[in-house]
Amino acid sequence: MKYLFAGGGTGGHIYPAIAIAKEILKNEKNAQILFVGTKKGLENELVPREGFELKTITVQGFKRKLSLDTLKTIYKAMVGLKEANNILNEFKPDVVIGTGGYVCGPVLMMAALKGIPTLIHEQNAFPGLTNKVLSRFVKVVAVSFEESVKYFKNKEKVVVTGNPIRRELLKVTKEEGLKNLGFYSDKPLIVSVGGSRGAEKINFTMVEFLKQKDKNLQVLIITGANQYEKVLEKVKTETIDIDETVKIIPYCHNMQDVYAAADIIICRAGAITLAEITAKGVASILIPSPYVANNHQEYNARVLEKAGASYVILEKDLTAEKLYKKIKYLLDNPQVLSKMRDNAQKISKIDAAEKIYKLIKSIT
């Protein structure tokens, strides 16, 4: 069978598609898989690295105000529809799967008009506009959170599957993770992750936190590449002594080690990050990004908070003092920390890729 994936822009739209594609190949060795994305998205790096073919089309998001840019966007949308149509005619997929991003619009719309079976996957608790529109035309809507169902009009099409994750994340033990990262096994490890682009408020708050931290506490700050030098400069300016219990790095390619080793993780609330930390049962303090569409990260974070798997601190309320108090409370009350871990695993859906694969087969 031939499978076409449309998704791109950010890792949050691409990683689920890759996970589903790998699940397909696990079950069908001879399956043909093609990815369609944009020319500037992260898919240009991630998809070929995983060994999949990628084709790109012209597309960009619509501005809400009428302007010259809006007219340009409409023109690009028409071009994108034509390019999507050409790819569909050439590849002749048996099914088309959309995992988010502007590229899904023209590809899924053309596929639906041609009568090709279609499925979309929504990663966030609050669905994006593109997926809400496409839900009227596709055969199945897979969602990651039970809370998402109410936002779709055609609820009979909606199936809760969870977010597909990379299976390698589950294979590393805590001892292996600590060893691989170069930390001691007899001291708690606090990890902060700002995401690939970094989060200045989280990073700078963590630098302030270092002034208060206990000597028996280990800290890993993953700054994001574009924030790394700023953070080092702030550490220098604040004259903070960094010993072997503290590591500050720009990026980590082996997040399976990080999730396995962390006692508490401080991070944003992107859907894929949350799927990964719940799968590993990591207690978390979530700082939702206020800079995303529809405030969807706070919606995601509140799901974990409601389940007792996380504490949520809004960025505007984040201080080193508040962070220190939360962390100290959790470390001083191991039964609470253990309960958070258990609650995280209870809401995880590690079989999401398998569920989505079965859904795909049910419509083809």
Curated annotation (Swiss-Prot):
One of its GO terms (biological process) is cell division. It is found in: Cell membrane. Pathway: Cell wall biogenesis; peptidoglycan biosynthesis. Gene3D superfamilies: Glycogen Phosphorylase B. One of its GO terms (cellular component) is plasma membrane. HAMAP family: MurG. This is UDP-N-acetylglucosamine--N-acetylmuramyl-(pentapeptide) pyrophosphoryl-undecaprenol N-acetylglucosamine transferase.
